[in-house]
């Protein structure tokens, strides 16, 4: 990969990872337009640069990530309950993270097999887009007074499992999950960002473990400059994308993202019908 290709792909990652538009679908188009061959390193590159995107969330919301709950625990709470009350933010992240983590470990081979189908990505982009056209009306605007309980966190985690189908978009699934639990657009989007940190970090570390286990250490070390550039670009672009997204959805909702998904899915299907040999990076 050239530096130009590295930067473009990292920009695509940063722009699409936290927006409900499917980063996988955009990677397919970017790869084809750039003429990048889907080698083992290119596949590794596309998930390793997720570290940069993950870091953008931690930096933007560092106060939320490193602030404990110092309010008094409920009267009569035992030691465990007081502990969970203090670490309330991390506890609910863990509750939401577990469903996808368990399914990911149990069905990793089946998920990898689905990731080979570009048609599935295109179809799910369109189906998800149609749903997003109406999700604002279906779930209204939510309420800032809605208590964020462990049950609601777990339900969002179940929604995240749907995103294992390529083309759905992890961001879309978890945001819709949050809105279905009565959260506002902003609260649902922000928890989606927070949940991305353990989810994407865990998935990336697991994939890197598989690479190293299969003797891919040299593959990573020989391309360290490319990986560093990709992570830096993804970090910067993801920060800008998150700021834009939060501001936009508070004012206008998700309909524009629905139409956008339908267009992108349609483009991929047309390219397939025209005989393009599209591959997932």
Feature-to-residue mapping (PLM):
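Multi-pass membrane proteins that catalyze or facilitate reactions on polyprenyl-/lipid-phosphate substrates
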Residues: 1-281
